[in-house]
């Protein structure tokens, strides 16, 4: 597995792809339910009455922080339409489309079958989305 780069260190599309894959790998392993009076912030249980802690201080571990950045900060603002976001989720193994379960990275054949498109069309949509995300990240780095 390649090393996952921080946003400021991303310099090519492959770095963006690795961050997206990494984010879904981290999310796949996190618990969903928290005990009473606790909230689950990406795998770490925090008492809900603790409001004075800064949001970024609640997270532990570099992997979780990087996954949270993709899932929270990038995801809603990146210039990719909802259909391609669903394709990204499905390819990365998230419960998307008709698959209601987590898995590893799905094959292009599975992605094509799910979206009723040719395998090369699925790859092209993926590549176009990754280019758009890369340009978005470059704008973040320049700001």
Predicted regions and their residues:
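Helix-turn-helix DNA-binding module
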Residues: 95-118
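DNA-recognition helix of helix-turn-helix
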Residues: 113-139
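N-terminal interaction/assembly modules
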Residues: 1-77, 109-110, 135-143
């Amino acid at each position: 597995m390649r090393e996952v780069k921080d946003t400021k260190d991303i310099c090519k599309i492959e770095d963006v792809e690795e961050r997206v894959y990494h984010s879904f790998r981290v999310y796949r392993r996190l618990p969903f339910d928290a005990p009473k009076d606790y909230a689950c912030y990406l795998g770490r249980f925090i008492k809900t009455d603790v409001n004075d802690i800064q949001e970024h201080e609640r997270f532990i571990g570099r992997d979780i922080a990087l996954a949270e950045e993709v899932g929270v900060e990038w995801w809603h603002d990146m210039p990719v339409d909802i259909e391609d976001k669903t394709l990204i989720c499905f390819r990365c193994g998230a419960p998307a489309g008709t698959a209601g379960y987590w898995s590893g990275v799905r094959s292009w054949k599975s992605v094509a079958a799910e979206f009723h498109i040719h395998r090369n069309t699925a790859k092209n949509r993926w590549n176009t989305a990754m280019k758009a995300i890369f340009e978005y990240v470059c704008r973040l780095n320049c700001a």
